[in-house]
A protein has these predicted regions:
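Catalytic-site signature of metal-activated, phosphate-bearing donor transferases
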Residues: 64-76, 91-157
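Active-site acidic Asp-centered loop
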Residues: 35, 85-87
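Active-site beta-to-alpha loop of glycosyltransferases that engages the nucleotide-sugar donor
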Residues: 2-21, 36
């Protein structure tokens, strides 16, 4: 089954090259929802992922309930596996278990932190190879507390 990522963005030209280079290898398709960016974000997406869709958000502010509804509406336009990620998130894992049956999996989050402001990074290397300090949440904690992400192949209501 096809895997589609949905991502909202606003002026993310700094982080988008890492997000796109990484996730284009994981997902078959992407839908990038532009919250009226004024930087080069759209051009970067077109350059690095020319087959991905870029849509202008129907929202003019970033209210959680409106964002969630818009993402659900976009996800429902596609068959297969769907996942929403922020531009700061990189999906890492083995997804060979994803089959053709409707299902949902919760994927725990990993947060990358680097307190060394002097460390220079380049878009030519994966970010996780340059920022090597991170942490995960205890696997026994509630998924909502851990900010887990859902990859699913079922329609959302």
């Amino acid at each position: 089954m096809k895997k589609t990522v949905v991502c909202t963005f606003y002026n993310e030209e700094y982080i988008l090259p890492w997000f796109l280079k990484h996730n284009r290898e994981v997902f078959d398709h992407g839908v990038m929802i532009d919250y009226h960016s004024t930087d080069r974000s759209r051009e970067i997406i077109k350059e690095l992922c020319p087959t991905w869709d870029i849509v202008m958000s129907r929202n003019f502010d970033f209210q959680a309930d409106k964002v969630d509804r818009e993402i659900m509406d976009v996800e429902n336009q596609f068959d297969g596996w769907k996942m929403c990620l922020n531009a700061t998130e990189l999906l890492v894992g083995d997804y060979s278990i994803l089959g053709d049956q409707p299902w949902q999996f919760l994927v725990p989050s990993v947060f990358m932190v680097d307190c060394d402001k002097e460390r220079l990074v380049t878009h030519d290397l994966p970010l996780y190879e340059q920022k090597t300090f991170g942490f995960t949440f205890d696997t026994q904690q509630n998924f909502l507390e851990r900010r887990a992400r859902s990859i699913h192949s079922i329609p959302v209501q």
